[in-house]
């Protein structure tokens, strides 16, 4: 019975990974058809209600909100808003779905940036090989954008570092960096405390972006399809996947789940390509594998105790 229970919770972890792998497609669709600010506000409003209601029912996560310093609410809240804005706006500025696939890969650099930012924030120690692992990940991003048969850096920089594409790339890097810093500040200020401010952060984000949406001209093409995608992004991705992940880490085979999670860049780029109808090219596969390998390598650059703690987060 124990074995079956562990299998069940491990399976929930796999489901969470699959759900996260599909999230970028819905962010893209909502940003283009509803508008980045309007969509982000609605998704976070619904998600916040789900999270906060659950916390109130279970009487956990908010009852001890005074136990964490004010800096947690200010800095982590600000980073959460930045992460959300850049995640949606980045998907709305690019013109082609092929660019979206590469941007998804960039966004999944967040485990790498989480590990790197532990050095200044949590005073973690890493070996010099960490620099090499970062270069491997960045090489993966560059290769993923090269077309088959066009493995030339001059071609890459000439074609991609201009216009709306470069804006999308920069915003995607901000998505990854902001989430990495957010993760470590949460750990610094709220570790071992029964406080979870995600619901509050989502609600604050919804209010701020909802206010911005009033002054921005956006398409707002609502339909049954778009409404269902809003519900999926807010409830399934925002609440259910996180719940599944937490349960799998606590009660499932954590090592197996975290191992599979390391390949989220591959899973997400493949699923995004399939859902958007974009051809899966060899450079994209090689690039996503390099990002996954670089991330795994970066974890090996920390000592065992730090590596185990960060593995749960990333």
Question: Across the structure, where does each feature detected by a protein language model lie?
Answer:
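Membrane-interface helix termini and inter-helical loops of multi-pass transporters
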Residues: 25-33, 62-63, 91-96, 145-164, ...
């Amino acid at each position: 019975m124990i074995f079956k229970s562990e299998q069940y919770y491990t399976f929930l972890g796999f489901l969470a990974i699959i759900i996260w792998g599909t999230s970028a497609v819905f962010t893209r669709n909502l940003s283009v058809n509803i508008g980045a600010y309007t969509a982000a506000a609605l998704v976070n409003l619904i998600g916040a209600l789900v999270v906060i209601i659950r916390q109130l029912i279970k009487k956990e996560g908010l009852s001890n909100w005074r136990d964490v310093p004010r800096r947690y609410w200010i800095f982590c809240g600000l980073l959460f808003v930045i992460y959300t804005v850049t995640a949606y706006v980045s998907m709305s500025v690019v013109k082609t779905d092929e660019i979206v696939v590469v941007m998804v890969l960039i966004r999944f650099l967040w485990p790498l940036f989480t590990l790197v930012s532990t050095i200044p924030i949590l005073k973690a120690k890493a070996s010099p090989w960490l620099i090499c692992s970062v270069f491997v990940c960045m090489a993966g991003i560059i290769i993923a954008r090269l077309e088959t048969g066009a493995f030339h850096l001059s071609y890459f920089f000439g074609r991609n570092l201009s216009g709306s594409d470069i804006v999308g790339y920069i915003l995607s890097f901000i998505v990854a960096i902001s989430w990495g810093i957010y993760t470590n500040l949460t750990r610094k200020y709220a570790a071992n405390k029964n406080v979870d401010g995600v619901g509050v952060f989502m609600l604050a984000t919804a209010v701020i972006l909802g206010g911005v949406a009033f002054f921005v001209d956006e398409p707002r093409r609502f339909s049954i399809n778009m409404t269902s995608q809003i519900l999926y992004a807010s409830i399934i991705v925002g609440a259910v996947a996180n719940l599944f992940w937490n349960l799998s880490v606590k009660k499932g085979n954590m090592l197996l789940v975290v191992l599979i999670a390391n390949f989220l860049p591959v899973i997400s780029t493949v699923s995004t390509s399939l859902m958007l109808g974009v051809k899966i090219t060899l450079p994209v596969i090689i690039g996503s594998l390099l990002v996954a390998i670089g991330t795994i390598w970066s974890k090996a650059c920390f000592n065992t105790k730090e590596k185990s703690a960060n593995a749960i987060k990333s």
